[in-house]
């Protein structure tokens, strides 16, 4: 989800996950701990009153850190198919948090009251052990192709961590305060040597069911609905399919957009604006759901 204004003079935004940098007994940096949730908050811009709407589950990243002869080895373990939550703010000012575990919606209404609506029917796909292993193998193959196309990718990641641990600028979305930093444009003196590698969780750590949606799946239209871009559980021709969910938590429509189109925005009365790339030109198209 993204931050949004609405008519009651409130600003809704997503906070940052808790991040704790640990130190070993020897005084060297240890593996940081990153929370797997982050808050969604609502602030009244007139009264400055802030409410925590709830917490959304985000992808869990496990970071390992070891030190050998002055060289730090960083391992970043990620889950390529995480079960997460999504959120959006409707045109009526209601905040919807869509839960990935069972696909239901927790609401904070515009007047501040809260409610939860029923689970949304979904054709859940069970992931067999073979499915999980094939997915991890496929993701690794994609990573290998990307690394071959950009040989300096891992080196750039390692340099970013070297800067952090030597007192320079941190990588995006990482905040740490450590001694030894200095100003100026060059790398800090005494910057440690860091090797950073991205790995993936074991297939057995993947969910037994394919998630209903990925991150950034939620969009609010101009008619009070939340559009959820779902993950297909069966081969489907055409573009992505969206569940259109009303304020009662009911799917009132399922909309498939054409291939190579992306939703750019909405208009009242079921109007959808789609963007389409044609070479170097981006075209905006107007369509109706009905």
What are these regions (language model features)?
Residues 1-290:
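Eukaryotic scaffold repeat domains enriched in small/polar residues
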């Amino acid at each position: 989800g993204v931050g949004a204004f609405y008519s009651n003079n409130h600003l809704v935004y997503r906070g940052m996950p808790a991040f704790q940098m640990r130190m070993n007994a020897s005084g060297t940096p240890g593996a940081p701990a990153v929370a797997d949730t982050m808050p969604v908050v609502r602030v009244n811009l007139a009264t400055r009153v802030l409410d925590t709407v709830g917490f959304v589950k985000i992808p869990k990243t496990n970071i390992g850190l070891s030190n050998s002869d002055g060289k730090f080895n960083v391992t970043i373990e990620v889950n390529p198919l995480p079960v997460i939550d999504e959120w959006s703010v409707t045109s009526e000012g209601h905040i919807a948090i869509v839960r990935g575990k069972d696909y239901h919606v927790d609401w904070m209404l515009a007047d501040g009251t809260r409610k939860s609506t029923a689970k949304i029917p979904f054709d859940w796909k069970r992931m067999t052990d073979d499915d999980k292993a094939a997915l991890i193998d496929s993701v690794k193959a994609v990573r290998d192709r990307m690394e071959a196309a950009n040989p300096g990718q891992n080196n750039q990641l390692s340099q970013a961590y070297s800067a952090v641990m030597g007192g320079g600028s941190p990588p995006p979305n990482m905040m740490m305060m450590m001694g030894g930093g200095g100003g100026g444009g060059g790398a800090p003196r005494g910057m440690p040597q860091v090797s950073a590698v991205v790995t993936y969780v074991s297939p057995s750590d993947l969910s037994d069911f394919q998630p209903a949606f990925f991150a950034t799946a939620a969009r609010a239209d101009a008619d009070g609905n939340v559009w959820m871009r779902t993950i297909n559980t069966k081969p489907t021709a055409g573009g992505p399919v969206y569940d259109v969910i009303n304020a009662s938590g009911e799917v009132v429509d399922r909309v498939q957009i054409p291939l190579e189109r992306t939703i750019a925005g909405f208009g009242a009365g079921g109007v959808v604006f789609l963007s389409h790339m044609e070479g170097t030109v981006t075209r905006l198209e107007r369509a109706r759901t009905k």
